[in-house]
Amino acid sequence: MEIGLGVFSGECLPSEGKTHTQVLADSLDQMRLAEAVGLDAIWITEHHFLSSGYVGSVLPYAAAAAQATSRIRIGVSVALAPLHDPVRLAEDAAFVDVLSGGRHDLGIALGYRDVEYAGFQTSRAERVGRLEELVAVLRQAWGNGPLHHEGRYFRRVGMEVFPKPAQAGGPPLLMGGHAPAALARAARLGDAFIMDGGTDSSVFGSAGHNRDLYGRVAGTLAMYREALAAQGRPTDDVRFYLTLGGFLHDDGPDAAWEALQEAYLYTRRVYGDWYGIPEETWGRWYPHLLTPEEHAQRRSEVALGAPEDLLPVMRRLRAIVGDGLHVMFRCKYPGIEDGVTRRSIELLGEVRRALG
């Protein structure tokens, strides 16, 4: 199995007392550290129109990551596919792949925030069709010869994208989502599926409790394999990506939660708003406002501790999925002091080495 480090959102909070330039420079240093300690990938994500500076320019950020590193894979999880022009995305992703020497993985999904669709003058009702046509254009653009795509949303005929990606056929296309339709789409069009293991996930609902991670992974994997079989695709040795939030600390789970909780609850408030959870619910997600029971619920959403605490979690997940599992472990959160995050990354490297 593999472990990647996520997510690099490029956010800069006032509490950090730094410029955005400094925060981004720190993030590139953290990517170098992830490579040095033996992690398999770093993951960059996309959203728009947030005062925190959440990164919208996801491929330029990936290009900077490619130049800052030499071995680790450079992943995007995820680009909001319906908001992108397919030829522009094909060119940018191919360029990152060439720049990195064939280390790029491109994750895509539909997106869901109305403000982002409005900002790009795109109808949310068209998002599935736009994503599917975008995939068709990407596949053509990364092959040989000129494009010939005449669809409902895009007409791209006669031009050819250069340079071609370093990886034959282009970067692996990973597809994320929550609904059964997303699994079916990934099996039909993608190279792998990205499952949201819990952090920032709508599966929490208003209760916020991470319900049966292992059962959900097993169930989602089974549905993905069924969808692959329906497409006549292999179901053994499946590549399966799982996002999982948490934090590592030398002193164990309590210390890890103490380091993480302010930043994590900030992130949960943001996503609670995005997912349409009532403000009277997520508006209370501050450490000083939560009841002891609510604290326990929030804490249950993430994997916490020293390496010896995380290893059983990773081994159990590997036993369910197999060696094709890639865990995108999120211990990179806005607002946590750089040195504290760096130590968490170092400890995550210990977990990766222990897994072999």
Task: Indicate residue ranges for each PLM-predicted region.
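Active-site-adjacent structural elements that line small-molecule/cofactor binding pockets in enzymes
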Residues: M1-G356
